[in-house]
Each structure stands twice: as structure tokens, then as C-alpha cells.
Curated annotation (Swiss-Prot):
Involved in lipopolysaccharide (LPS) biosynthesis. Translocates lipid A-core from the inner to the outer leaflet of the inner membrane. Transmembrane domains (TMD) form a pore in the inner membrane and the ATP-binding domain (NBD) is responsible for energy generation. Residues 353-589 form the ABC transporter domain. SUPFAM superfamilies: ABC transporter transmembrane region, P-loop containing nucleoside triphosphate hydrolases. This is ATP-dependent lipid A-core flippase. The gene is msbA. It comes from Pseudomonas syringae pv. syringae (strain B728a). PROSITE patterns: ABC_TM1F, ABC_TRANSPORTER_1, ABC_TRANSPORTER_2, MSBA.
């Protein structure tokens, strides 16, 4: 099979898969088809009525239906105007049924695809987000889905409505003069070749447009999210140039596709009208015994053909845009979800954590991030991970809730390998607070009681906020817990956001706490309050703390000193200082040694 044949086969498979999304709307879709059948049937009627109009010019008293009872007295003088009005009404009914019900299918399809894409995002593994441009993900949900809908509904609208129009007109022409009609059929192979050539170009160009649109979304998203950095470092000109370049690239690709269509459509029209010219010559040359009305009706019907044929040929562009968009959408939908082969569910675990000979490589890289890590933590113990940035601390913390899967070594929670737990159940036992806090554009109360915590009693929410020392600023806000925090908590300070994240973790009341730089954004006073709260909360819970501040880790039951993915020292704060080794050097520098170049 050649490359072009393989591509064509792939396009057909993608398109039929896309059409499967129309299945839930098949009843509404059939109503739209009926509407388009009605619409298409009026085209030869209009041509036919002209025959009687022209014949009526020579004999106004002639009747339209001489052999039909009750209508044999109806003269052309009355019948022709009446029929034109009736045909127009019939056509309007068909147009309404077709367009309205197809719009319902189209909008439903947009909704279904967007929801499925978004739902898929929530179950994709972390590694997918590590390697995929966020702008392209957003563009798929917004731009690509619209292109796909055009292929699944708008294209079908043209194919059905204009296709039936062509069929009905050809039937009418064959009935009037089959020999002349065969002349028009002779151009169909040439039209097919032109459509096939244009389709390949349209699909190739559509893929490039969608990638370029993703780049535009990505640059805009990055700049909006980092607007403070942009302004602080005078990056306005750079970002303006970067966005202009991305937008210009998209514009040029759009123009290239428009140019293809602008060349292709006139060429197709030239072929069609050349055939019409030959047909008109033959009609005049071979008119024989045909009446003037017959000739006018035939030419009118033939003259109605170029428009639907042109629209049918142009639908290839819409279909190829949709196929290109659907290909990227289905690629995302076909990505394997997070591995969840576990079967064990526990109502609550004690929090006994044990790591045995754990090693880890990030997917699709050959560099080892963790090497033979082993330690254990009993309920109520606090384990502190210390080391310069890039030593593997956060990677280790991300393996415990299975944000990444491990293949070498074991991580046991209450004596059970974490891979044996059902994923959702495992994460229910873990509360995590990261350095980069995520808040949603909602109220303070809803940000604390998020996800599975939604619906928690207001008293519990307020108690968690108090334990996180967040009440002192919440009570000063005009709407208190009902205050909107803005996108990602933009209306709050860094320390306030951090305390809300800690309150969220406290409300979860999980037996295992992971605090990844959890107090790094707090001022000294806030950190002192948080430390007091954490001392209380950590009782009876396993706590894994990653911190650069001495005050956070000095009380740890066990400190694991990491470097280059290995545990190089372990012990209490006092024991490690007495060893006068790596930890002592970090301690002397304030525990915040920069990462080496290339560290992960």
C-alpha cells in the first residue's frame, strides 16, 4: 500500500469514528435529512414550473392538469403563480427542518467532544502533561473541536442537501433528454480528480494550521500567567514579538489554505461552465420538436447544477480540516490512562510507610533520578528530606501517591504495595501540600473543602482554617469564607494561599501528610504559627516533609540527606551535625544550596 493510499484509508477510519459521535442524535439527525430531502426536491420543481410559464406565454388559457379531476379547470394563468408560492413554502419548510435539527446535532457534538476531552485530561498520567504543550491541549478543546464539528455535521449538511439536489436535477434532466444529460456526466471523472488532489492539500495544511493555533494559545497563556515576571523584567517587547511571530505563522498558514481554495474553486467552475456551454450548444443545435418551455426548463435545470456541484467539491476542505482536527483529538483520547490495576480498598490506614530499594527513571529518559532508596516511617513519625534542589526529594514525594509509577523496588503503605491499592483509595489516605499552591476561582470555603471534601460541615472548614492560622486574614475579609480568591488565588498573598492549601490538607484528615516546601512562602510569624499547628496535626500521622528551612526539620524524628538521587546520610538533627558531614555543610549554608546544572 502506498503512502497516499494509507493516508486515505486512515482518513476514512478517522471520519467514520467521528461520525459515531452522531449516533446518540440519530433521531434528530433523520429529521434534518428529511428536511434536506424536501429542500432538494424543490429544485427540479422550480425548473419544471418555468416550462409551464413559457408555454403559458403562447397559450395562457392552457390548463396545467388536464387529466386530474377538480384541477382540469385550473389554467396556467392561475396555476403557475400559485405553484411558485407553494414550492417556496415547501422549500422553506425543508430548509428549517434541515438547518435547525442539524444545528442541534452539531452543538450536541461540540459539547460531547469537549466534555470527553476534558474528562480524559483528568485521568491522563503525569508524564503526558510533562511532554505536552498546555496551549495545544487548550486549543484542542476550543479550536480543533469546532473544526471537527464542521466535518461531522456541516459537511454532511452539504453532502445531503446539495447531493440530493444534484440527484433530483439529474433525474429530471434524464427524463427530459437522456442523451444530452450524458454529456454532462462526462465531466464527473475530471471533477473527481480535482477534488482528490485538493483534499490532500487541505488536510496537510489543516494540520499545520491547528499546530500554529496551539502555539498562539500557548504563548498567550504563558504571558497571561506570568504577567508579573514579564513586567518586572521588561519582557513586554520580547513577548509582543513572540506572540506576533506565532500569530503571523498562523496567518500565513491560513492564507496558504485560502489560496489553495481560491485557485481550486475557479478552476472547477471553469470545467463545469465549459460543460454547460457545450450543453447549450447541443440544446440549440438538436432542439428538434421540443417546445420553448421544454428547452427553457432543461437549460434552467442544468443551470442549477453548478452551484451544488461546486459546494460538494468545496466540502472536501471542511472534511479535511475536521479529519486533521479529529486525528489530534483521537490521539489524546487514545492515550492510556493512569495505570490502576490495584484491587485493595481500605477505609483508613494507620500510615505506616516503608520504602525498599527504590530506584526510578523518568519515562523516556536514561538518567536515573532515584537510586536504591530505603527507609521506613511509623505512624506519628516525621521524616524530613533534605538536600539541594534536584537531589530527588520531590520525585520521591510524587511516587508515593503514584503520580508516577515505579518498577524497581517497593513502596509499602501498611505493609501493602501501593500499586495494589485502587488509585483513588490510595490518594484518599494522602494529603499533600506543594510549594506551588493551586487555588481555584471560587470562594475560600470551597477552596478548602475541594473535591471529595465538598459538602464538609462549615464548622469543620472553619476549624481547619483556624488550625492553619488562616482565620486571622479570612475574618478580616468583607465576605469572610465566602470571599472569591480570583484565578489561582491572585487576590491573596503567597503566605495566605499557602495557609489555605494547608487548611485543605488538614480538613482531609489523611493518615499520611506530604509537605513539599509547605512553609516556604510564609513569613517568619506565619511559619511559627503553622509549625505549632503542624506539631498538633502530625500526631498519629506519618509526615514526610521536604523543606529548606531549618525550623521545619529540626524536630524531625529522622532526617534523610539526599544527593544525586541517593540517601547519603540519615539521622536526627543533632546526630547529623555531630557527624560533620554533608548535612553539616548544608546547615552551615542555611540548607538552601543551589542545584547543579542539569539537575532534576
Amino acid at each position: 500500500m502506498t503512502t497516499s493510499e494509507s493516508s486515505a484509508t486512515s482518513s476514512v477510519k478517522i471520519y467514520f469514528r467521528l461520525l459515531s459521535y452522531v449516533r446518540p442524535y440519530v433521531g434528530i439527525f433523520l429529521l434534518s435529512i428529511i428536511g434536506f430531502v424536501i429542500f432538494a426536491s424543490t429544485q427540479p420543481m422550480l425548473a419544471g414550473i418555468l416550462k409551464y410559464f413559457v408555454d403559458g406565454l403562447t397559450n395562457p388559457e392552457a390548463v396545467l392538469f388536464p387529466n386530474v379531476p377538480y384541477l382540469r379547470e385550473l389554467q396556467l394563468l392561475q396555476a403557475v403563480p400559485l405553484l411558485i408560492v407553494l414550492i417556496a413554502a415547501w422549500q422553506g419548510l425543508g430548509s428549517f427542518l434541515g438547518n435547525y435539527f442539524l444545528a442541534k446535532v452539531s452543538l450536541g457534538l461540540v459539547h460531547d467532544l469537549r466534555v470527553e476531552l476534558f474528562n480524559k485530561l483528568l485521568v491522563l498520567p503525569n508524564r503526558y502533561f510533562d511532554t505536552t504543550n498546555s496551549g495545544h491541549l487548550i486549543s484542542r478543546i476550543t479550536f480543533n473541536v469546532t473544526m471537527v464539528t464542521g466535518a461531522a455535521t456541516d459537511a454532511i449538511k452539504v453532502v445531503i442537501r446539495e447531493g440530493l439536489t444534484v440527484v433530483f436535477l439529474f433525474i429530471y434532466l434524464l427524463m427530459m433528454n437522456w442523451k444530452l444529460t450524458l454529456v454532462m456526466l462526462a465531466i464527473l471523472p475530471l471533477i473527481a480528480v480535482m477534488v482528490g488532489t485538493a483534499s490532500k492539500k487541505f488536510r496537510k495544511q489543516s494540520k499545520k494550521i491547528q499546530v500554529a493555533m496551539g502555539d498562539v494559545t500557548h504563548v498567550a497563556s504563558e504571558t497571561i500567567q506570568g504577567y508579573r515576571v514579564v513586567r518586572s523584567f521588561g519582557g513586554e517587547a520580547y513577548e509582543q514579538a513572540r506572540f506576533a511571530q506565532a500569530s503571523n505563522s498562523n496567518t500565513q498558514k491560513q492564507l496558504r489554505m485560502t489560496k489553495t481554495g481560491a485557485i481550486y474553486t475557479p478552476m472547477l467552475q471553469l470545467v463545469i461552465y465549459s460543460a454547460m456551454a457545450v450543453l447549450m450548444f447541443l440544446v440549440l443545435f438538436l432542439r428538434g420538436e421540443a417546445t420553448a418551455g421544454d428547452l427553457v426548463a432543461y437549460i434552467t435545470a442544468a443551470g442549477l447544477l453548478p452551484k451544488p456541484i461546486r459546494q460538494l467539491s468545496e466540502v472536501s476542505s471542511t472534511i479535511q480540516k475536521g479529519v486533521a482536527g479529529a486525528e489530534s483529538i483521537f490521539e489524546q483520547l487514545d492515550v492510556e490512562e493512569e495505570v490502576d490495576t490495584g484491587t485493595i480498598e481500605r477505609e483508613r490506614v494507620t500510615g505506616h510507610l516503608e520504602v525498599k530499594n527504590l530506584s526510578f527513571f523518568y519515562p523516556q529518559t536514561a538518567r536515573q533520578v532515584l537510586n536504591d532508596i530505603s527507609f521506613s516511617a511509623a505512624p506519628g513519625q516525621m521524616i524530613a528530606l533534605v538536600g539541594r534542589s534536584g537531589s530527588g526529594k520531590s520525585t520521591l514525594a510524587n511516587l508515593i501517591p503514584r503520580f508516577y509509577g515505579h518498577d524497581i523496588g517497593n513502596i509499602l503503605l501498611d505493609g501493602v504495595e501501593i500499586n495494589d491499592y485502587r488509585l483513588r483509595n490510595l490518594r484518599r489516605h494522602i494529603a499533600q501540600v506543594n510549594q506551588n499552591v493551586t487555588l481555584f476561582n471560587d470562594t475560600i470555603a470551597n477552596n478548602i473543602a475541594y473535591g471529595d471534601l465538598a459538602g464538609a460541615p462549615r464548622a469543620d472548614i472553619e476549624a481547619a482554617a483556624a488550625d492553619a492560622y488562616a482565620r486571622e486574614f479570612i475574618d478580616q475579609l468583607p465576605q469572610g469564607f465566602d470571599t472569591q480568591v480570583g484565578e489561582n488565588g491572585v487576590l491573596l498573598s503567597g503566605g495566605q494561599r499557602q495557609r489555605l492549601a494547608i487548611a485543605r490538607a488538614l480538613l482531609k484528615n489523611a493518615p499520611l501528610l506530604i509537605l513539599d516546601e509547605a512553609t516556604s512562602a510564609l513569613d517568619t510569624e506565619s511559619e511559627r504559627h503553622i509549625q505549632a499547628a503542624l506539631d498538633h496535626v502530625m500526631k498519629g500521622r506519618t509526615t514526610l516533609v521536604i523543606a529548606h528551612r531549618l525550623s521545619t526539620i529540626e524536630k524531625a524524628d529522622l532526617i534523610l540527606v539526599m544527593d544525586a538521587g541517593q540517601i547519603v546520610e540519615r539521622g536526627t538533627h543533632t546526630e547529623l551535625l555531630a557527624q560533620n558531614g554533608y548535612y553539616a555543610r548544608l546547615h552551615a549554608m542555611g540548607l538552601d544550596e543551589p542545584a547543579p546544572v542539569g539537575a532534576v
